């Protein structure tokens, strides 16, 4: 991928935008908004000329002309609140969609039609799916689908409140991946651990924290070696055996909670997270709120140490960065991107050492992806 062959797609509550860089990624051109009547969670490309948009209002939309025009692509998709759409890199034309209520759909013809992956109904503990989220969150959503570039049979998925699952046979069977994940969120400290059952509201939150330890907010699979990285409701985890066992490498008790995670492979794996220290739940436009300094954290030594990266990022914010709102390109010098629920997009060309605002005033950004 060269610097002038991609665009950054920003999905928002009211449509989506493309940001196109110049050759040096010094200037960015913002497109007119598209799909403006839809609540868009994510825009992706399949590498073969097709773009797909996951809509929380009307299912999947497809473009076959580089995003200039869009049409619904929902035949067979019987749940239209779509959180995730992902192209299988091993099978051109094969697209997956994750929806509300924990359903997984597959298209073998680039979105012309869909069939439900019914094997997921037999996944371990499936009968207990359906955790009732409090604190203004989303309910049961199949929000993440990931592939292992080194193994065409491995597929990962995440359903909110129910942890990470993996298939080793292309989706025929599924395995729950919870070994090593804390049995409960840490309690009694700052951040997610600040709940104490001193009053009825706090008692409810205390119970909530004890139950959501298995809630994976996002995973990413290394394209180099298949290692898996997880941002959990209660911590950051690494796995070097495809999720069979997790290691807690959280920054500290104050910064365990967050939504996105990403990895850029180089001389070392550079892993990025954006914590929400001491999250504030009374902010419905943002799920929960980052208040104060907006900070990105990076580790390049498997979580032994973390660098706090704030150069170019604002302080005094009241915002959030959602699970799908962090991405990178595959240039020789990778660009890193993220968007906030207050409508700002940021870019770094030095692995997060410094940041530049490349878009503002877009409304609630829900997804950031590199397409092309």
Over which residues does each language-model region extend?
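Extracellular glycan-interacting surfaces
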Residues: 1-372
């Amino acid at each position: 991928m060269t610097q002038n062959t991609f665009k950054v797609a920003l999905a928002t509550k009211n449509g989506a935008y493309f940001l196109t860089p110049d050759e040096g990624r010094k200037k960015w051109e913002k497109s007119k908004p598209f799909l403006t009547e839809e609540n868009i969670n994510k825009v992706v490309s399949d590498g073969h000329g097709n773009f797909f948009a996951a809509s929380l209002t009307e299912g999947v939309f497809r473009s076959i002309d580089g995003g200039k025009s869009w049409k619904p692509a929902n035949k067979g998709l019987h749940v239209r609140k779509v959180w995730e759409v992902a192209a299988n890199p091993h099978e051109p034309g094969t697209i997956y969609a994750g929806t509300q209520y924990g359903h997984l759909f597959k298209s073998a013809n680039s979105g012309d039609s869909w069939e439900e992956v019914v094997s997921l109904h037999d996944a371990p503990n499936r009968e207990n799916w359906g955790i009732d989220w409090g604190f203004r969150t989303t309910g049961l959503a199949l929000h993440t689908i990931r592939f292992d570039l080194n193994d065409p049979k491995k597929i990962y998925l995440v359903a909110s409140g129910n942890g990470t699952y993996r298939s080793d046979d292309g989706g025929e069977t599924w395995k729950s991946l919870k070994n090593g994940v804390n049995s409960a969120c840490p309690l009694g400290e700052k951040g997610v651990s600040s709940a104490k059952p001193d009053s009825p509201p706090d008692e409810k939150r205390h119970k909530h924290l004890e139950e959501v330890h298995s809630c994976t907010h996002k995973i990413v699979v290394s394209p180099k070696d298949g290692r898996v990285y997880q941002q959990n409701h209660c911590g950051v985890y690494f796995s070097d055996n495809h999720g069979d066992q997790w290691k807690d490498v959280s920054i500290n008790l104050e910064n365990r909670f967050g939504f996105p995670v990403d990895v850029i492979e180089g001389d070392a794996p550079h892993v990025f997270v954006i914590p929400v220290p001491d999250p504030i739940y009374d902010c419905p436009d943002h799920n929960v709120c980052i208040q104060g300094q907006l900070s990105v954290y990076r580790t390049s030594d498997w979580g032994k140490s973390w660098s706090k990266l704030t150069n170019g990022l604002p302080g005094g914010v009241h915002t959030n960065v959602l699970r799908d709102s962090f991405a990178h390109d595959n240039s020789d010098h990778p660009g890193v991107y993220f968007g906030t629920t207050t409508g700002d997009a940021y870019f770094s060309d030095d692995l997060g050492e410094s940041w530049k605002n490349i878009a503002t005033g877009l409304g609630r950004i829900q997804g950031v992806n590199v397409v092309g």
